[in-house]
A protein has these predicted regions:
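Sec-dependent N-terminal signal peptides
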Residues: 4-13
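N-terminal leader/linker segments that initiate helical-solenoid repeat arrays
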Residues: 18-87, 91, 102-108
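Positively charged n-region of N-terminal signal peptides that target proteins for export
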Residues: 1-4, 19
């Protein structure tokens, strides 16, 4: 009987913690997506980066909007920062390929990577 009660208690706690984490992810996605829709990419960067690091498989919008955010950062940054953002964009495309392979053809990623490296060599 104690094992059953303990098991039920453990399940309840784990479901509760999972739903809280999921709510945080939903809120972060909502926050940065609204900033991106308003083209306020600088404000969107921090919540986007937190969600990308915490839950990379949560939603493909992390990668779609992330590409816009990083392209904005590349255009509006110094030479030092630009190189870091370019490398981050290349990494973002690889992460998208790993986490959402059905939505990311390899040819598209390779073509985008080559074009980006050519444009900013």
């Amino acid at each position: 009987m104690k094992k059953i009660i303990g098991f039920i208690l453990l399940l309840t706690i784990s479901f509760n913690s999972f739903s809280q984490a999921n709510e945080e992810d939903i809120n972060a996605l909502s926050i940065f997506s609204e900033y991106v829709k308003a083209k306020n990419y600088d404000a969107a960067f921090q919540p986007w980066m937190e969600l990308r690091q915490r839950s990379p498989k949560f939603n493909s919008a992390i990668y779609v909007y992330g590409e816009r955010i990083l392209k904005h950062k590349i255009k509006n940054s110094t030479a030092e920062e630009k190189e870091n953002f370019i490398n981050d964009l290349l990494k973002l495309w690889e992460e998208k390929r790993e986490n959402f392979p059905s939505k990311t053809p390899l040819g598209d990623i390779l073509a985008k990577s080559a074009q980006l490296q050519y444009d900013y060599k």
